[in-house]
């Protein structure tokens, strides 16, 4: 089948989880050849949709059609650490048969296993090399590889099968800059139908179209992420104009209805006066009264219907406006004076991971990006600075109050409400003060009383961020470990907004260069056994 014939079709899908939570109802989607980026808020059903298309889940209603061999790279990989590379690639049996034939064993069974794949080892090594894995060979085990290498290996297995349809679910989450570059190259070279769920801006700039999943349906936008954002901004500006016009119409209809009531009341008083003074025959006045009542009723109904229609148009206009509120906070307690000493590192050796040579003194409100290949020790270093780990040797001396946002958002007590979680980190604040500040993080009213365990991914992130930033004492050194890994685009934007208000020093371990640039990084460091200065350009190139 040629690449131009590949496609995915979902017709009238309905899917709910066993607890009754509805994900899709009457859902339709068609994806043709080319690269499609699927975006949407955390929890809207993106990963569920990919699992439905892959056949891992079954819809309660509807039909899914896939033309072309299908490959699926899920967000979470479950690989046995004892598996060898050739087993993950699915070529171990053919390698064994090739070895047997080369050793002189010419039984028919070996030829049946090999089929036409006499060059399978060469093709496998070439595929690995194309993804930057040429160094691992075919006999290494999963347990000897990093998380990023495992993701690329699983992608290599899919590419080796030459599928016509490829599903990728947050493929860059655990990849370092070098591995991301290799994955971007694979996406650029793709010719079949590709559907990728991602919040990675660089990856989404490479797609041909954007499918925006929102409230159980998809809206299509031609072009990459930048084109989508431009089109959405135009749409939202038009929607806001429609709302303002509809609001104006509602107010006008209310005024006209009120004026009509006043006019009818005056006519009623005049008619009663005519009746009381008997200026005309009773029969004539009775006819006029009945006609006036009919006319008044019609007039009232007409204006009431016009008001109802105007209110309906307002509801429709408001439904087109996205309620993407911004985080607007002030954090004066986090201020660090220029030149003030914040952190001293000297040849730190964390209790796990590689040791690091070199010295670092953080002064003032520096914003430092911590980069390096997977396994270079970024997480171990941050945990050591935060006090979660004790250094085996060297000096690790935070000189100000420190806050740490780990990769896993396990800072919150799931059984406690959002407001109680924040109150625990700021024991000197009143309940009203905590609630007022939480509102700036978009937890207003009853939302602040929800148990942390019931929050969506984006909500949980905001609550965790609030717990850290609203702490007493306020953190004047903030450590973030891959903060954008599990966030949708809206949550990444809100993190950026919150960090705009942060006035302390910042150390961020991340491979997400666009995010790092958006938060105003002032110094780029690379870990490779030493603490080395680098540049954004070098990090973007995978260096």
What function would you assign to each model-found segment?
Residues 35-36, 48-109, 364-432, 511, ...:
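ABC ATPase nucleotide-binding domain signature region
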Residues 1-16, 94-151, 234-352:
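Coupling and communication elements adjacent to P-loop NTPase active sites across diverse families
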Residues 166-170, 175, 405, 477-482, ...:
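Catalytic Walker B motif of ABC-type/P-loop ATPase nucleotide-binding domains
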Residues 82-87, 216-241, 527-543:
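Conserved beta-strand-loop-alpha-helix hinge in the C-terminal portion
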Residues 200-206, 227, 410-411, 513-518:
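Conserved H-loop
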Residues 155, 183, 465:
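Hydrophobic anchor residue at the start of the ABC signature
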């Amino acid at each position: 089948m040629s690449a131009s014939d590949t496609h995915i079709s979902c017709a009238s899908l309905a899917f709910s989880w066993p607890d009754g939570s509805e994900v899709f109802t009457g859902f339709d989607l068609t994806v043709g050849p080319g690269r499609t980026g699927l975006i949407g808020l955390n929890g809207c059903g993106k990963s569920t949709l990919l699992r439905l298309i892959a056949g891992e889940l079954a819809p309660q209603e509807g039909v899914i059609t896939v033309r072309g061999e299908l490959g699926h790279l899920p967000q979470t990989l479950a690989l046995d650490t004892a598996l060898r590379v050739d087993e993950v690639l699915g070529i171990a049996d053919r390698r064994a048969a090739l070895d047997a034939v080369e050793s002189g064993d010419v039984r028919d069974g070996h030829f049946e296993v090999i089929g036409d794949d006499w060059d399978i080892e060469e093709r496998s090594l070439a595929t690995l090399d194309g993804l930057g894995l040429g160094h691992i060979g075919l006999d290494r085990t999963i347990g000897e590889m990093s998380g990023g290498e495992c993701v690329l290996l699983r992608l290599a297995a899919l590419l080796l099968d030459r599928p016509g349809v490829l599903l990728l679910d947050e493929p860059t989450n655990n990849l370092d800059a070098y591995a991301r570059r290799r994955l971007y190259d694979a996406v650029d070279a793709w010719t079949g139908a590709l559907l990728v769920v991602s919040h990675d801006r660089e990856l989404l700039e490479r797609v041909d179209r954007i499918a925006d999943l929102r409230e159980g349906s998809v809206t299509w936008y031609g072009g990459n992420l930048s084109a989508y954002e431009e089109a959405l901004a135009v749409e939202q500006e038009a929607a806001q104009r429609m709302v303002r016009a509809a609001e104006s119409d509602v107010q006008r209809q209310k005024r006209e209805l009120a004026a009509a009531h006043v006019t009818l009341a005056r006519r009623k008083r005049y008619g009663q006066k005519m009746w009381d003074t008997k200026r005309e025959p009773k029969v004539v006045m009775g006819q006029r009264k009945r006609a006036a009542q009919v006319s008044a009723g019609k007039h009232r109904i007409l204006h009431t219907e016009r008001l109802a229609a105007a209110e309906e148009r307002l509801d429709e206009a408001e439904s087109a406006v996205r309620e993407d509120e911004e985080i607007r906070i002030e954090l004066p307690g986090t201020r660090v004076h220029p030149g003030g000493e914040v952190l001293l590192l000297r040849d730190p050796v964390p209790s796990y991971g590689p040791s690091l040579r070199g010295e670092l003194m953080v002064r003032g409100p520096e914003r430092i990006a911590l980069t390096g290949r997977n396994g270079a020790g970024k997480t171990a270093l941050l945990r050591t600075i935060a006090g979660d780990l004790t250094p085996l040797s060297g000096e690790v001396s935070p000189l100000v109050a420190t806050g740490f946002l780990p990769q896993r958002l396990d800072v919150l007590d799931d059984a406690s409400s959002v407001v109680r979680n924040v109150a625990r980190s700021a024991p000197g604040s009143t309940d009203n003060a905590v609630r007022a500040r939480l509102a700036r993080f978009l937890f207003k009213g009853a939302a602040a009383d929800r148990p942390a365990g019931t929050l969506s991914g984006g909500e949980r992130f905001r609550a965790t961020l609030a717990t850290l930033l609203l702490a007493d004492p306020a953190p004047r050194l903030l450590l973030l470990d891959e903060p954008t890994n599990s966030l949708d685009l809206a949550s990444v934007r809100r993190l950026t907004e919150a960090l705009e208000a942060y006035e302390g020093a910042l150390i961020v371990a991340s491979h997400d260069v666009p995010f790092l640039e958006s938060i105003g990084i002032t110094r780029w460091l690379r870990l490779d056994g030493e603490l080395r200065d680098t540049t954004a350009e070098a990090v973007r190139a995978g260096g």
